[in-house]
Amino acid sequence: VGDNGTNVKAQSRRDGTYRLKLDKDTRYVMLATSRGYLNQKHELSTIGLKDSYLYAFDFTLAPISKPVKMNNIFFEFGKWTLTPESENGLNELVQLLNDNPNITIELSAHTDLVGNDADNKTLSIRRAQSVVDYLISHGIDSQRLTPVGYGEEKPVIIDETLHKQYPYLPKDQVLNEAFITTLSADKQEVCNSLNRRTE
């Protein structure tokens, strides 16, 4: 959709590529959709371009049923207070929910294995609620949000991406206490940081 009133729909080819011709001196909002996936928006502008320009943008749509880790949501140590560094990640989540008005989400908070199980469970519940409160304060309907705290009940399972990033973590390894305690202190901290997450 362009700010000059243009509204163009394009379907991607079998290989996932697409091509659109854009008008000059126009701001656009592009929306990629596919059944079973979350929508994704991208903004671009041709304002000020003098010559023809080839603009490439790849949309990476996340499956609706797969948990999406929110990498930029941080809490004060041992607390459920969101840090100022979380604002960008939280605003991305607000945008995701605004772009996908028909979805509801379970917001899951997880802790590491350090400390008491019951305390970790309580902490994770409060952290999930803190994120939900932020979303509600930014216009998201509370009926679309379910906060859940898992504490240390659901440790990370190492996927291919994490294995490449941390070669000492075997693919499909569950980051549970039995495994983590076999590692050096610095590697244990990496595992603990992976388990501390919001999805």
Give residue spans per PLM region.
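Short, acidic Ser/Thr/Gly-rich low-complexity loop/linker segments typical of extracellular
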Residues: D3-T17
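Surface-exposed coil/turn segments at beta-strand junctions on protein surfaces, enriched
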Residues: Q11-R13, K21-D25, K50, P63, ...
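A short, solvent-exposed beta-strand micro-motif common in secreted/extracellular proteins
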Residues: G16, L22-Y37
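Periplasmic OmpA-like peptidoglycan-binding domain that tethers envelope proteins to the cell wall
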Residues: H110-E199
